């Protein structure tokens, strides 16, 4: 059960605005506080939140992986309790910087959870009984009282972005959009999306066509596809609309020699296979063989038969050399809000070097007249346009194609929601998608 209260956010800064995004002074908002149902049951839920949150704060692994393992190791936790625990953990993660600044040196999984439940009787929740959190100390209670009144948030905390990344991105509207919750996007696989949509509807799952992608469906609701037969039968695959569009914009044909060079678990390679209806051949390469090994299992479910994995890339005549480059992942913060705390300045420098090396390799292995395609799921300029500008300065044989023309000939959509024709920058602002960068460059044919 939930209890809602209305109130005003003091300058958009009050600690009680944690359940919402930054709002200007005087903006009416809805606070959502968690109402206890049965106190002992609720206390054990709070303890579970603390345990899961502690692991996330201490571990470098993605939060969703940690939560999955937490619940897998505790199969006795029911579905409603799992959802409650996961929702609370994600709520805290999405406002981690505000919690941290408000609590100061007292910030911990315990105090963050207590602050999240501050509208409840904390002495009943933190009662020290079996499966319940230990009682709050005087110091913790004092810190919580101060945190509830705290308003002096840094601008970076208001937009939930580490200071060094806040300075790089700068665009507060974009950061605000990256703090929202992403919809559930899927693409049709080897079928018409209307057919997939009707089948989903029969299973009680309601999707609408995506606004740009002709193969996509979207639900604004939380969707669990684990027991969905449409998904299990391979008629749909989870894929953000921007990623779907990028797959289409690669303009692959069955006669092309295609390589998905940083294939990972094969998301784009599998989309290519579907677009070609199993005609032609797609080579998939990744330095992480474990990730690459997942492609086979995914391809079996999707009935994709035209993908082959490759360890060593030697041929230099690829007509589509596609680089889905390793990156900061800053464009996916709507789905992975913890990722912003795992990236460091040093790691970003390493990634930039890797991206440049991969571009050099791709340039060497792209056929004359072919396209070298560079993709990231980042919104950081140094990973995107600056990386391309640096590459083009050293490689006059490559030139960006006209992306406005590419967009219109691929999608037959008059609206062009981008500011540049040299590349495409998808974001929750302009395309209502994750943040992606796409640049297709053509390699000149040597004059005879």
PLM regions and their residue ranges:
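S-adenosylmethionine
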Residues: 27-448
């Amino acid at each position: 059960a939930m209890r809602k209260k209305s109130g005003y956010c003091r300058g958009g800064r009050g600690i009680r605005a944690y359940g919402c995004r930054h709002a200007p002074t005087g903006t009416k908002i809805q606070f959502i506080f968690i109402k206890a149902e049965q106190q002992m049951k609720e206390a054990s839920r709070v303890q579970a939140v603390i345990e899961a949150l502690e692991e996330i704060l201490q571990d470098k692994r993605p939060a969703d992986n940690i939560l999955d393992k937490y619940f897998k190791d505790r199969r006795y936790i029911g579905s409603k309790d799992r959802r409650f625990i996961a929702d609370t953990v994600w709520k805290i993660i999405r406002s981690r910087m505000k919690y941290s600044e408000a609590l100061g040196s007292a910030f911990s999984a315990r105090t963050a959870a207590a602050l999240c439940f501050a509208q409840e009787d904390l002495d009943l929740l933190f009662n020290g009984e079996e499966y319940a959190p230990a009682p709050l100390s005087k110091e913790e209670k004092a810190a919580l009282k101060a945190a509830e009144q705290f308003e002096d948030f840094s601008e970076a905390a208001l937009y939930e972005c580490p200071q060094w990344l806040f300075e790089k991105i700068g665009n507060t509207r974009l950061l605000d959009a990256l703090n929202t919750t992403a919809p559930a996007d899927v693409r049709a696989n080897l079928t018409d999306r209307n057919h997939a949509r009707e089948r989903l509807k029969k299973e009680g799952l309601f999707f609408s066509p995506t606004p740009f992608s002709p193969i996509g469906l979207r639900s604004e609701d939380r969707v669990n596809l684990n027991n969905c037969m449409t998904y299990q039968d391979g008629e749909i695959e989870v894929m953000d609309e921007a990623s779907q569009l990028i797959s289409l914009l690669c303009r692959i044909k069955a006669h092309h020699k295609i390589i998905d060079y940083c294939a990972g678990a094969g998301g784009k390679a599998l989309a290519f296979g579907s677009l070609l209806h199993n005609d032609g051949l797609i080579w998939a390469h990744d330095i992480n063989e474990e990730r690459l090994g997942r492609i086979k299992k995914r391809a079996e479910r999707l009935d994709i038969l035209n993908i082959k994995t490759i360890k060593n890339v030697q041929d230099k005549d690829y007509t589509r050399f596609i680089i889905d480059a390793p990156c900061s992942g800053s464009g996916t913060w709507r789905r992975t809000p913890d990722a912003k705390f795992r990236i460091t300045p040093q790691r970003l420098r390493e990634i930039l070097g890797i991206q440049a090396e991969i571009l050099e390799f791709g340039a060497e292995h792209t056929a004359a007249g072919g396209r070298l395609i560079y993709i990231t799921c980042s919104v950081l300029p140094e990973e995107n346009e600056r990386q391309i500008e640096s590459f083009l300065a050293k490689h006059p044989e490559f030139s960006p194609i006209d992306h406005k023309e590419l967009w219109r000939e691929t999608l037959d959509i008059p609206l062009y929601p981008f500011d540049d024709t040299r590349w495409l920058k998808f974001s929750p602002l302009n395309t209502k998608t994750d943040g992606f960068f796409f640049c297709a460059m053509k390699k000149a044919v040597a004059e005879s």
